């Protein structure tokens, strides 16, 4: 089935006004063809500040620029439910590409949409330049088929981490020449930002809500298996994934290749027969892989 638009911008937002305006106008003003862009907004139904700003400022601007958009209001799912907002917006989007965006992000590259469209028809997760070249795709861009296969973008709150780790396991991460500034409050230390630094959902793999909790990782592998089958059926290379599941390849080799500023670390866990984490420690194999790649 053909999609109506080329790129859907998935944009949950709460309370931000000026930041949202800067984010949206950067997307629209720097696009080559706004007729092929769909903006998907997600608001909390109790966010009167955000809703008023949308109706008074954002909506008139988009109408004037003739940009397609849709705004959905949700019962607040909180920061812990961030992935649920994206999953709902992705389900409603009608585009070839689903672009996970934030209201504190600002596009920098002119004709960014043309860069993305160069990859249409390829099964890749696209990664923009941001965050001091963090190896993850902080603002992941995935083909519609990705959502259709798994029926969600992310099971876990850390949507960029989940999608990126799956892309590394499947070897479908593609860096593109698009630059984005992320004005995240943790990075900018902006005391005026209405949303303060967030609770992080990693660092304690014994916690069922943690990104690295074993069952959460197992679900990611399950989703990778579904996507890998689709890739095989379409004649795409799955050799890296096959090597990972057979134990012949180190799972995070592709991640380490992109971690040029050493922003990530890997660890291994010991679990009991019930899947409970007994202990975890730094993964010595990861450092060995780094040393090999550095030669």
Regions found by a protein language model. Give the residues of each.
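Active-site-proximal specificity loops/subdomain of glycosyltransferases
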Residues: 50-93
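Short beta-strand/loop segment that forms part of the nucleotide-sugar
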Residues: 35-48, 72-76
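Short, acidic, metal-binding catalytic loop of nucleotide-sugar glycosyltransferases
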Residues: 25-36
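C-terminal catalytic/acceptor-binding lobe
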Residues: 161-295
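A conserved acidic beta->alpha catalytic loop
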Residues: 41-56, 105-106
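Short beta-strand-to-loop element that shapes/binds the nucleotide-sugar donor at the catalytic cleft/hinge
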Residues: 124-140
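Conserved donor-nucleotide/metal-binding helix-loop-beta segment in metal-dependent transferases, i.e.
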Residues: 110-128
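Short beta-strand-to-loop acidic/aromatic patch adjacent to the donor-nucleotide binding site
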Residues: 95-106
């Amino acid at each position: 089935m053909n999609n109506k638009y080329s790129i859907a911008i998935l944009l949950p937002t709460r309370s931000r006004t000026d930041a949202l305006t800067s984010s949206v106008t950067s997307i629209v003003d720097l696009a080559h063809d706004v007729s092929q862009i769909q903006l998907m907004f997600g608001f909390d139904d109790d966010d009167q500040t955000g809703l008023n700003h949308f109706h008074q400022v954002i909506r008139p601007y988009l109408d004037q620029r003739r940009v397609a958009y849709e705004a959905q209001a949700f019962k607040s799912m909180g920061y812990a439910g961030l992935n649920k907002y994206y999953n709902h917006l992705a389900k409603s989007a009608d585009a070839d590409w689903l672009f996970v965006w934030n209201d504190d992000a600002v596009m920098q590259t002119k004709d960014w949409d043309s860069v993305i469209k160069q990859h249409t028809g390829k099964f890749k997760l696209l990664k923009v330049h941001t965050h001091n070249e963090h190896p993850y795709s902080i603002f992941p861009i995935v083909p519609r088929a990705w959502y259709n296969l798994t029926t969600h973008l992310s099971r876990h709150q850390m949507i960029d981490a989940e999608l990126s780790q799956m892309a590394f396991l499947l070897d479908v991460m593609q860096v593109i020449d698009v630059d984005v500034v992320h004005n995240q409050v943790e990075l900018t230390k902006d005391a005026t930002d209405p949303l303060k630094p967030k609770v992080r959902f990693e660092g304690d793999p014994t916690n069922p809500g943690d990104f690295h909790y074993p069952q959460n990782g197992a679900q990611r592998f399950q989703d990778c298996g579904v996507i890998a089958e689709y890739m095989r059926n379409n004649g795409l290379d799955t050799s890296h994934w096959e090597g990972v599941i057979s134990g012949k390849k180190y799972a995070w080799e592709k991640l380490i290749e992109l971690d040029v500023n050493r922003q990530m670390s890997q660890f291994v866990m010991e679990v009991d027969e019930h899947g409970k984490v007994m202990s975890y420690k730094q993964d010595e194999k990861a450092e060995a892989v780094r040393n090999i790649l550095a030669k």
